[in-house]
A protein has these predicted regions:
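Extreme N-terminal starter segment of soluble prokaryotic enzymes
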Residues: 1-5
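N-terminal phosphate/diphosphate-binding loop that engages ATP/GTP or pyrophosphate donors
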Residues: 7-90
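Short, high-confidence coil segments that cap the C-terminus of an alpha-helix
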Residues: 31-32, 104-107, 254, 275
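Ligand-binding beta-strand-loop-alpha-helix segment within the catalytic cores
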Residues: 73-78, 82, 87-90, 186-206
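Phosphate-binding/switch loop-helix module in NTP-utilizing enzymes
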Residues: 81-123, 128-132
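Non-catalytic interface/targeting segments
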Residues: 113, 198-259, 315-350
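Conserved catalytic-core segment of NTP-binding enzymes
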Residues: 114-194, 262-298, 302-324
Length: 350
């Protein structure tokens, strides 16, 4: 059994994206996989059990057999936090070691850390505490957001030494890709850090379901409720002159247009282009002809009481931060990893 920790020093770097993409490719090659998420922050009620939503969907997509509770070591809650502060034992480390033992028949077990190398320290289950204990190797997953992300990778080298397999750099914007390849990667390689993959930001993987948007802005759906499982890839604010709106909207596919309820001119133009939904801010109700046209075009209209700025701010918090649980997103992850990840090199050194 090869235990592989996927760790990062900041949230939403895409650790489970790599587990899914790499995992689906390895399954295709005949490998038996295991999966454990160290700390769950997405409580999800399934029948009478509280489990971690992300861990559940990853295990389902990878078709890993076992009870739902076998895929997440510890789920954070207010009660758990209080017990930690009262120095009460929660047996998190014991539970983790039991989960590892349950998956000892696997070829590779992916263990996903939290939002930093030290998260879980108070429970005894941070990556820093566990890597040596179970003789694991480490893969660092970092997003490219600024040059200081290099420090996180160098820190992992310092902390985990020969246990570090290398790193992957995720969510690189198109205009910085060549810079990362030609400057960042050589710098890290000189310091004996393998780079297995550089992945560009992907519109499909960053896309958000309309139902999640509604939830985040406390919205009310006016029409076309059957379309709320559709995905939005782009967001545009419709605050311009109508004469400019069409050329602005037509360049951006699969979008949500955010505008005021009084801007029926913008709403009509948005519906003539590739628009997934229209979000009306300020709590105003759209005019009846607009609702009729939206029904004809099968475009949901959502109303929120938030102003435009607050609406955009809330939606931005969702982008790239939702759980991958849809088959088409998992398949996209598989395709990207197949093309961009040095799978053979990875398998040789684990």
């Amino acid at each position: 059994m090869n235990n592989i920790f996927l760790i990062s020093n900041r949230p939403f770097t895409g650790k489970n994206f790599f587990v899914l993409g790499l995992g689906l490719n390895l399954i295709e090659r005949g490998y038996k996989l295991g999966y454990i998420k160290l700390i769950g922050k997405l409580p999800y009620k399934k029948e009478d059990k509280i489990i971690d939503e992300e861990a559940y969907y990853v295990s389902q997509i990878l078709n890993i057999k076992g009870e739902e509770k076998d895929f997440c070591c510890f789920i954070y809650s207010y009660d758990a936090q209080q017990k930690i502060l009262e120095s009460k034992s929660l047996n998190a480390e014991k539970n983790f070691l039991e989960l590892v033992e349950k998956q000892k028949d696997k070829d590779i077990v992916f263990i996903v850390g939290g939002d930093s190398y030290f998260e879980g320290q108070s429970l005894g289950i941070s990556p820093v505490q566990l890597v040596e204990k179970i003789d694991s190797r480490v893969l660092v997953v970092q997003t490219y957001d600024c040059e200081t992300f290099v420090d996180d990778i160098l820190a992992a080298k310092e902390l985990f030494k020969e246990k570090l397999l290398g790193a992957v750099i995720n969510k690189v914007v198109e205009e910085r890709y060549e810079y990362v390849v030609n400057n960042i990667v050589p710098y890290l390689k000189k310091r004996d850090i393998n780079i297995f993959s550089i992945v560009k930001k992907d519109k499909l993987l960053e896309s958000v379901a309309i139902e999640k948007i509604i939830e985040s802005i406390n919205g009310k759906i006016i029409c076309c409720e059957e379309k709320i499982s559709d995905f939005v890839e782009n967001f545009l604010v419709g605050a311009m002159d109508p004469s400019c709106a069409f050329s602005y909207f037509i360049r951006t596919p699969n979008k949500a247009v955010i505008t005021g309820a009084h801007r029926s001119d913008i709403q009509v133009i948005a519906m003539e282009t590739s628009t997934k939904c229209i979000i009306l801010t300020g709590g105003g109700i759209p005019e009846e002809p607009i609702i009729t046209k939206a029904k004809e075009k099968n475009i949901p209209i959502i109303v929120t009481n938030f102003d435009t700025f607050s609406t955009v701010e809330r939606i931005e918090r969702l982008i790239g931060k939702t759980v991958i649980k849809e088959k088409h997103k998992a398949e996209r992850a598989k395709q990207i990893i197949s093309k961009e990840f040095k799978i053979d090199e990875f398998l040789k050194i684990i």
